[in-house]
UniProtKB/Swiss-Prot annotation:
Signal sequence annotation: none
UniProt protein name: Small ribosomal subunit protein bS21
PANTHER family: MITOCHONDRIAL 28S RIBOSOMAL PROTEIN S21 (PTHR21109), SMALL RIBOSOMAL SUBUNIT PROTEIN BS21 (PTHR21109:SF22)
Alphabetical list of NCBIfam families matching this protein: S21p
Natural source organism: Pediococcus pentosaceus (strain ATCC 25745 / CCUG 21536 / LMG 10740 / 183-1w)
Any one GO MF annotation of this record: structural constituent of ribosome
């Protein structure tokens, strides 16, 4: 869980920007979206192989 304390004389926009940065760096939102719905193991394997294929093609060019 990301925690951000608003500093003295800091605007709310700046604090929100810092919070968003910490959340994105920790990968919390990405993990939530990944686990939002159940994926069958066969679907996980298929997505994993497709991602590997995309990385391989990207590396080749």
């Amino acid at each position: 869980m990301s925690k951000t304390v608003v500093r003295k004389n800091e605007s709310l926009d700046d604090a929100l920007r810092r919070f968003k940065r910490t959340v994105s760096k920790s990968g919390t939102l990405q993990e939530y979206r990944k686990r939002e719905f159940y994926e069958k193991p066969s679907v996980k394997r298929k997505l994993k192989s497709e991602a590997a294929r995309k990385r391989k093609n990207k590396k080749r060019f």
